[in-house]
Curated annotation (Swiss-Prot):
The keyword Magnesium does not apply. The gene is LPMO9H. Lignocellulose is the most abundant polymeric composite on Earth and is a recalcitrant but promising renewable substrate for industrial biotechnology applications. Together with cellobiose dehydrogenases (CDHs) an enzymatic system capable of oxidative cellulose cleavage is formed, which increases the efficiency of cellulases and put LPMOs at focus of biofuel research. GO terms for cellular component: extracellular region. It is an enzyme of class 1 (oxidoreductase). Transmembrane segments: none annotated. Pfam families: AA9, CBM_1. It is found in: Secreted. Optimum temperature is 65 degrees Celsius. This is AA9 family lytic polysaccharide monooxygenase H.
């Protein structure tokens, strides 16, 4: 499909389709960096140069377990490297902010990996990247909630720390939520990998070994094929073990942006951060960003009454919300607790 055709299709469904989400930006040391926006940037002939990887997830969709052995699981569907990077120091904390609000029903783990690029990340072959896990939070029995719940409570954001002893160099940060609301059934889990280019300064000499992205998970792993609806579940976060000295997560908080940065391109530089009067993030949840919504004319009459958007919940035990799906999708039963517009 050409981009022109895809743009027409995207605009036609813009008022109806609202899937799960993507990372909108990061905040590090008070500086806001814009990420790739698959819902708008993909359609632009000259999209902005950003730190995030380009991916063909215009519907804010996911990678299914049947594709975990393919390159799509590395940095999302048909992903290509971002055109620039952000500079951080070893030991820095990065606030990763999602949009739109992560669905309450989409419970599951939050996982972060790094991979050394051994050169410019902007031109790296994604199949050559070897990923090591720097955090991975699943179900917290003491708190009685999933990591995705903690992300929602933290202003729809996640705080991750770059290892303080990490060797300086260029790295890709792979941040991911795995939604388990349909994981009781084969091929029911939903992975949302997001990749961001970083240049890490300072640090030490630690460069952990890693695994290829296509080897991170299997569709039958205990943390992928899993019933999350049991009381106080015993859950194993999928993927390789955490690197030595890493914790499953750090204490979560949001970060206030006091300046706006731009992506640095190889051999050049991004603009110096400029002060901003609007906080990109603040204590839960008050991200303030200007957005523009375009609604295309309806070519067919929508169903009457409450209509659930594509990928939204449309049924399940105790469900009292919409049961009619937007045009182009139908209500599919994933298990007795959850039905989804697909």
């Amino acid at each position: 499909m050409s981009k022109a055709s895809a743009l027409l299709a995207g605009l036609t469904g813009a008022a109806l389709v609202a899937a799960h989400g993507h990372v909108s930006h990061i905040v590090v040391n008070g500086v806001y960096y814009r990420n790739y926006d698959p819902t708008t940037d993909w359609y632009q002939p000259n999209p902005p140069t950003v730190i995030g990887w380009t991916a063909a997830d215009q519907d804010n969709g996911f990678v299914e377990p049947n594709s975990f052995g393919t390159p799509d699981i590395i940095c999302h569907k048909s992903a290509t490297p971002g055109g620039g990077h952000a500079t951080v120091a070893a030991g820095d904390k990065i606030n990763i902010v999602w949009t739109p609000e992560w669905p309450e029903s989409h419970i599951g783990p939050v996982i972060d990996y790094l991979a050394a690029c051994n050169g410019d990340c902007e031109t790296v072959d994604k199949s050559s990247l070897r990923w090591f896990k720097i955090d991975g939070a699943g179900y917290d029995k003491a708190a009685g909630r999933w990591a995705a719940d903690a992300l929602r409570a933290n202003g729809n954001s996640w705080l991750v720390q770059i290892p303080s002893d990490l060797k300086a160099g260029n790295y890709v940060l792979r941040h991911e939520i795995i939604a388990l609301h349909g994981a009781q059934s084969p091929n029911g889990a939903q992975a949302y990998p997001q990749c961001i280019n970083l240049r890490v300064t300072g640090g030490g000499s630690n460069l952990p070994s890693g695994v290829a992205g296509t080897s991170l998970y299997k569709a039958t792993d205990p943390g992928i094929l899993f019933n999350p609806y049991v009381s106080s579940p015993d859950y194993t976060v999928p993927g390789p073990a955490l690197i030595a000295g890493a914790a499953s997560s750090i204490a979560q908080s949001t970060s206030v942006a006091t300046a706006t940065g731009t992506a640095t391109v190889p051999g050049g530089g991004g603009a110096n951060p400029t002060a901003t009067t609007t906080a990109a993030t603040s204590a839960a949840p008050s991200t303030t960003l200007r957005t523009t919504t375009t609604s295309a004319a309806q070519t067919t009459a929508p169903p009457s009454g409450d209509v659930q958007t594509k990928y939204g919940q449309c049924g399940g035990n105790g469900w009292t919300g919409p049961t009619v799906c937007a045009p182009g999708s139908s209500c599919s039963v994933l298990n007795e607790w959850y039905s989804q517009c697909l």
